[in-house]
Amino acid sequence: MTTSEQQIELDLIAKLGDLKYTYRPDIRDRTALEANFRAKFEALNRVRLTDSEFQRLRDSIVTDDVYNAAQTLRNINSFERDDGTPLNYILVNIRDWCKNDFEVINQLRINTENSHHRYDVMLLINGVPVVQIELKTLAVSPRRAMQQIVDYKTVPGNGYSKTLLCFLQLFIVSNRTDTWYFANNNARHFSFNADERFLPIYQFASEDNKKVTLLDSFAEKFLAKCTLGQMISRYMVLVASEQKLLMMRPYQIYAVKAIVDCIHQNCGNGYIWHTTGSGKTLTSFKASTLLKDNPDIDKCLFVVDRKDLDRQTREEFNRFQEGCVEENTNTETLVRRLLSDDYADKVIVTTIQKLGLALDGANKRNYKERLEPLRNQRMVFIFDECHRSQFGDNHKAIKEFFPNAQLFGFTGTPIFEKNASYQQIEGQQASYRTTDDLFQRCLHQYTITHAIEDRNVLRFHVDYFKPEGKNPPKPGEGVAKAKVIETILAKHDTATNGRKFNAVLATAGINDAIEYFELFARIQNQKKEQDPEFRPLNVACVFSPPADGNKDVQQIQEDLPQEQEDNKKDPEGKKAALTRIVADYNARFGTNHRISEFDLYYQDVQKRIKDQQYPNTDLPAAQKIDVTIVVDMLLTGFDSKYLNTLYVDKNLKYHGLIQAFSRTNRVLNDSKPYGNILDFRQQQNPVEEAIALFSGEKIDNPREIWLVESAAEVIRKYEAAVAGMSRFMTDKNLICEPEAVYNLKGDTARIEFVNRFKEVQRLKTQLDQYTDLAPAQKERIDTILSPDQLQSFRSTYLETAKRLKEIQSKEGDQAPPDVQQLDFEFVLFASSVIDYDYIMSLIAKLTQQKPGKLTLNREQLIGLIQSDAKFIEEREDIAEYIRGLPVNEALDEKQIRNGFDRFKAEKKTRELTDIANRHALDAAALQTFVDDILRRRIFDGEHLSELMAPLNLGWKARTQKELALMDELTPLLHKLAQGREIAGLAAYEEGR
């Protein structure tokens, strides 16, 4: 440990002392930890345990299941004493967490059979370790710090699963200036997949969303005894259906507190303005369930719109806490539950429509009369969306019938005076009551401006189509549909990162949607005839059919004003067109949908838009949707991380514009830098007005936060990054060429190259998705770094990164600090087009081409593979296989696949036989040992000892022999695992 690291630790302990934590320097090992826990347990439960009782108690509560441990921590539990009598006990004071003993310990060592780790700082509540704090001196890469903890937790028999550390709820990582925290979880929710997602990690913030990152301030705001107790007891959610711990974000916590305080003080109504994609359901759930134990109120109703199907929200609520919400199958059930005194009926999820029927005096069933005893009770109504079409009609009825009721609403896009009246249907004005009129005041704001700054949602890149000709259309007017389609076909691959993502085309009406669908088919067929290499887009279309008295469709259409209006004209024509569209969908995707069961078709379309994560494993590429044509559907409330582009051929304004744009800006990783908008109606002014209205912040220029930089600015940064890389190479007396990277001396130089080129590639990834680059700009980008040079640099980057990653894996904590903190971001170097299937088909084509007509020779194909991160473990094998293919022998794709599988199997057998011979081991036994590791994805030290047993070596000689074998075997295991984690291997390498 360096002095400065030690100083950070001592300063933190001193700060916690100021916060009235007790420092326990005597607790440094497992024995002392357990003795302290025993003393606290006996004092809390007013009991003295015998040694055998304590041992049985400890063994019964220690578990490798984080979720079960979290429940044990929060519940009253039972234990049988030596004399057979039951002991009901708690681990901490669950009624008043502030009254627990809070202690801080440091440099704890927990030694188990396979694990010898030291932990910087731990916080104990009543002797139970609940928070681990890892301190660093270097600039913390949160992903690297997380990776380290994940690695520790994957060691078989680690301290986290075999000791009291199983009760850890939170991990905190800090380098004094930058502090992050995240929830503990079981392995399936604690995995680290640098390609697609990271563990949910958080920075704390104040109520006005100012970040609290300094460790000293963080300790004061977050680790104060009562605050930490609340964070763990009130603001962590145990998701029953997924057996997962969920930490609420700071803005969610403040919103819940605001509602609870407002009810406690009985100070009227209020609304929560939290932007789309910010997790409103979790916030409203927590508010509702905390009110369940609030004696100030009699009932809490969580009200959704029928279109959202209360079943869906109920399932979401019950996902957070099993059985917490009962189903109201009809209005009669709702009324019965409202009148019930049962604790289970205190929180009720219902629909606006059922609530309206219950309060309708004209209803024959006299619901309103039966509810009369509740008239003066304290009722709380929480509305999941303030401005559903049905809301206004019921608001007045609720206020009149329940004069003591308090109403709370959630919205991502409030209605202000300015947007209270706007065009909802082409040619018609619609009016809304403002959110302030309905709910009096805003209790908490977390706007899109906040969310973009927090990287919880992405910025937007808006490309306004510039029509040409003598009389171009004015802003707000459409252009010819054929021109729109030609533009989409030209720009789609750029906008969607080579079809890694997909798009929605928003049209002005149902007739437009039908026309677009038919025109897409016609134009793409023509292009296919002209060019056999043309790859058509998979186009789907979805709009609601004429209702014809169908209640399900009527419900769907309640918030689809344009579709409702359009279906009044020529309903049979609309129905026939939708039937053709669904038939085309069935033929394309092998489904069997009918418009009579429209909702099933609609759900399938949504699933195909969402299932885009893997090149072929969730859905084959041919089974994915590229563009979905819509009118009103999917433009509000629909979320997919793999939707990144919106094509707009309809007039949008204010909240309608923000809702539609927000479909594209869900965060994935650096391969999705922003949401792409291609607007064919030149709506610059409506965009500027919406940004000004919904920024929610008194800032000079919110558009700089909401919108990405101009292409010219990013090109300037790209040029500067390449120039910086060139200067770096010159300083090392090397020319700035890919092959020169291999001549860099020392890991420090290699690390600098990795960081510099990673920035080059990040900027290039951004530019690659700009759809509005002028020809001169494209030329300039290629001049800065030619495509061939870029590909070669990518290849050398991957080779260098692979070498440094091996040091990272092998040496762990002992690796140099700058190597430890490296984050390679391989996702920037993986093309969605170039997957395994694509490579196999390219190799097949290569063998089938005549020598004079080669579009891609062997070395070019190898270069393409070696510049893609997906093949980092197999790149050498694929290159060797391609070079070994016979000349002038045409092979189909199946032959290529089978040949490559044989090639790999034979090479693996040869390599293992060579290793076995060098170490005097039986080749078949070594093969079985390796196959077992790969099958289970777990490295088991006992199996290694069994493999060595026939050599009859003493302990010391056997240990040396094992280390020598694993030195050779580990790189091969990593390669054969193809990037998948092998539990226990990283820690084994680290301990060598």
Segments the model singles out, each with a brief description of its role:
Residues 142-145, 152, 184, 191-193, ...:
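Signature of the SF2 helicase/ATPase Hel1-core->accessory helical subdomain module
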Residues 346, 476-630:
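Conserved C-terminal RecA-like helicase domain
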Residues 14, 42, 50, 268, ...:
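Catalytic cores and motor modules of nucleic-acid processing enzymes
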Residues 125, 264-268, 341-344, 361-379, ...:
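Short basic/glycine-enriched coil/helix segment immediately N-terminal to the Walker B
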Residues 299, 344-347, 377-380, 404-408, ...:
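Loop/turn-to-beta-strand initiation segments
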Residues 275, 305, 508:
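P-loop (Walker A) phosphate-binding loop of NTP-binding proteins
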Residues 2-299, 308, 312-324, 343-344, ...:
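ATP-dependent helicase/translocase motor core
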